[in-house]
Each structure stands twice: as structure tokens, then as C-alpha cells.
Amino acid sequence: MLRNNKTIIIKYFLNLINGAFLVLGLLFMGFGAWLLLDRNNFLTAFDENNHFIVPISQILIGMGSSTVLFCLLGYIGIHNEIRWLLIVYAVLITWTFAVQVVLSAFIITKKEEVQQLWHDKIDFVISEYGSKDKPEDITKWTILNALQKTLQCCGQHNYTDWIKNKNKENSGQVPCSCTKSTLRKWFCDEPLNATYLEGCENKISAWYNVNVLTLIGINFGLLTSEVFQVSLTVCFFKNIKNIIHAEM
């Protein structure tokens, strides 16, 4: 009786954690697909050659797909108490654990490289911004405008970065997104006291660092849950085995 009660309790917690993993797997797949397919967001627009976005997207989609698969297998194994499926389930969780460790290491080691890439790309976008010969870059200019308006900043270091832009009607102009203006055009003539003086670099770096730390924190939380899930699966497996032996 006690052994049966223990089995029910372990099964309940296994299904609970398994359901949470299923939702997370779907979220990983969705986020990975969004990064891969949406070319109108800040992350993809400044990574033209897909040095970072494609590998990260593929890892997220692969990890999400495998998570959904092992959750479905796990549900069948747990519900029907199929021992070989429980072994497969534990192995797949261990594999996902290893992939997440690699992903965390990749994010940490590439952090400075990603920041340098964005730094160089923003400099390039500033120099080409508003060019009549580059209509294909309008998406990048729009994203830069959204960044400057949302973060209330101007240029990479400050508003003087826009001096190097040669597409203005006069040298004193800055993008309308650098000001409190609501005009929908590339450049505006606004006084200095109506212009955002702080550069965007520090604000983007702060945003990026916070999100990287958040992502790593979530990842380590998942790793802990996976260790707990594997331990529960092993306990469940042993409990089923003991029940079978007791009934023989």
C-alpha cells in the first residue's frame, strides 16, 4: 500500500514537471523560429551574415523540438509505467542538459563579440542613414529610430556621432528620433535642448547584459529542474521494478 502511494506521488510530480518542460519546449521552438524568420527585429537586422542568430536559432529550435518529443515520450512512459520508455526519457533529459550547458557557455563566451558586432553595425547604419541610394536599408534605419526613441538616446556615444552622416540637408540636423519631435521623417532641425544628448551604446549594453544574465539564470534553473526530474524518474523506475518483483 505504501509503495503504491509512493508511486502515485512520484508520478504526480513527474507529470507536473513534465508539463512545465513541454510548455518551455514550445516557447524555445517559437522563439527560435521568430529569430530565424523575422528580419525586422533588432537582433537580426544588425547580424546580416547570420554569424550568431542562425546557430542560436537552430540550437533553440532543436532543443525545443527534442524537449517536446521527450515530454510526450515521458508522459506515455509515466502514465503507462513502461520502464524502457522511462530509461529513454531520462537519457533525453540528460542530453538536453548537456545542450543547455553548451548554450550557456556559447552565450557567455560570445558576449563581447556580439557587443562589438552591434557597435560596428550601428556605426555603419549611422553613416548610411537616410541615403537615397540605399532604400534596402530602410528597415535598419527604422529599427535604429525605434531604439533611439524608446531609449531616449542619440547616436552611438552621443548626438555628435551624426556629424559623420553625409545625407543631411545641413550639418546641424539629427534624426527626428533623437528629439522629442513627432514628425515622421529622417532628419529634423531641433534645438539642442530638445535633443537627447546621451548615446545609445551604454543603454544597449545594459539592456543586453541584463537579458543575458536573465537567460543564463533561466537556463540554470532549468538545469536544476532537469537534475531533479532525472532523479525522480530513476526513483519511479526503481519503485515500479520493486512492485513487479513483489507481485511475482
UniProtKB/Swiss-Prot annotation:
Alphabetical list of InterPro entries matching this protein: Tetraspanin/Peripherin (IPR018499), Tetraspanin_animals (IPR000301), Tetraspanin_EC2_sf (IPR008952)
Residue stretches spanning the membrane: 16-36, 59-79, 87-107
Keywords annotated in UniProt: Glycoprotein, Membrane, Transmembrane, Transmembrane helix
PANTHER family reported in the protein's UniProt record: TETRASPANIN, TETRASPANIN-19
Protein family membership: Belongs to the tetraspanin (TM4SF) family.
Highest rank taxon of the organism: Eukaryota
Lineage, uppermost ranks: Eukaryota, Metazoa, Chordata, Craniata, Vertebrata
Keyword Oxidoreductase: no
Official protein name in the record: Tetraspanin-19
Any one Gene Ontology cellular component term annotated for this protein: plasma membrane
Keyword hit for Glycoprotein: yes
Membrane topology qualifier: Multi-pass membrane protein
Localisation per UniProt entry: Membrane
Residues modified by glycosylation: N5, N158
Gene3D superfamilies named among the record's database cross-references: Tetraspanin
